[in-house]
From Swiss-Prot:
Residues 86-150 bind DNA. The gene is WOX4. Residues 71-83 have a biased composition (Basic and acidic residues). This is WUSCHEL-related homeobox 4. The lineage of its organism: Eukaryota, Viridiplantae, Streptophyta, Embryophyta, Tracheophyta. Disruption phenotype: No visible phenotype under normal growth conditions. The double mutants wox4 and wox14 exhibit reductions in vascular cell division. GO terms for molecular function: DNA binding; DNA-binding transcription factor activity. One of its GO terms (cellular component) is nucleus. Its main location: nucleus.
Length: 251
């Protein structure tokens, strides 16, 4: 009896042990699925997963097409530093460069082509910093200044000519005076001729009435009565006329 009970007890304890072990194994197998079924908040990622996610994000954001602009911005830092200093980017020509450019301009060069600009830039680079655009704009500005200078000279010459004509030949006061004086002279000439004709006719009539047609009349063009009186006195002194007796009767 005791052996049977022991065997029964052992078998029951073994069965319990097997059931507990099977339950523990089943729980271990179902343990990873427990958080999903329970709906509990997910556990924070481990350090290794965080590193991998961080590296993945960097690879996504840093791309080959974006590396170019970053390098370009890095290269543009020196010009930005130059802009902080006023006049840093401007071309400051030397005396030698200006002298050579003026010599070329006086020689007849006005609009150099690309090859000429490149050659001039190469030669002038020996005397200081210079670029091709500096050479091009120098010629353009020099031509513009020369055109403005010519316009100023033309305006000055025109103003001088206009002032000379207004004060000299084409002065309205002078022209009016000359016109009035010339018109008066023209009007006086026929009047003088008429007076001379009248005087000559009067002298001829008097001479004919006195019988001296061949008498030379002096000072026919004199207009004053005094000259007429002197001529009459000469005539009377030279010839005694019966019309004017020296001793009239009745006195």
């Amino acid at each position: 009896m005791k052996v049977h009970e022991f065997s029964n007890g052992f078998s029951s304890s073994w069965d319990q042990h097997d059931s507990t072990s099977s339950l523990s194994l089943s729980c271990k197998r179902l343990r990873p699925l427990a958080p999903k079924l329970s709906g509990s908040p997910p556990s924070p990622p481990s350090s290794s997963s965080g590193v991998t996610s961080a590296t993945f994000d960097l690879k996504n954001f840093i791309r080959p097409d974006q590396t170019g602009p970053t390098k370009f911005e890095h290269k543009r830092d020196p010009p930005h530093q130059l802009e902080t200093h006023p006049g840093g980017t401007r071309w400051n020509p030397t005396q030698e460069q200006i002298g050579i450019l003026e010599m070329l301009y006086k020689g007849g060069m006005r609009t150099p082509n690309a090859q000429q600009i490149e050659h001039i830039t190469l030669q002038l680079g020996k005397y200081g910093k210079i670029e091709g655009k500096n050479v091009f704009y120098w010629f353009q500005n020099h031509k513009a200044r020369e055109r403005q200078k010519q316009k100023r000279n033309n305006l000055i010459s025109l103003s001088c000519q206009s002032s000379f004509t207004t004060t000299g030949v084409f002065n309205p006061s002078v022209t009016m005076k000359t016109r009035t004086s010339s018109s008066l002279d023209i009007m006086r000439e026929p009047m003088v001729e008429k007076e001379e004709l009248v005087e000559e006719n009067e002298y001829k009539r008097t001479c004919r009435s006195w019988g001296f047609e061949n008498l030379e009349i002096e000072n026919r063009r004199n207009k004053n009565s005094s000259t007429m009186a002197t001529t009459f006195n000469k005539i009377i002194d030279n010839v005694t006329l019966e019309l004017f007796p020296l001793h009239p009767e009745g006195r």
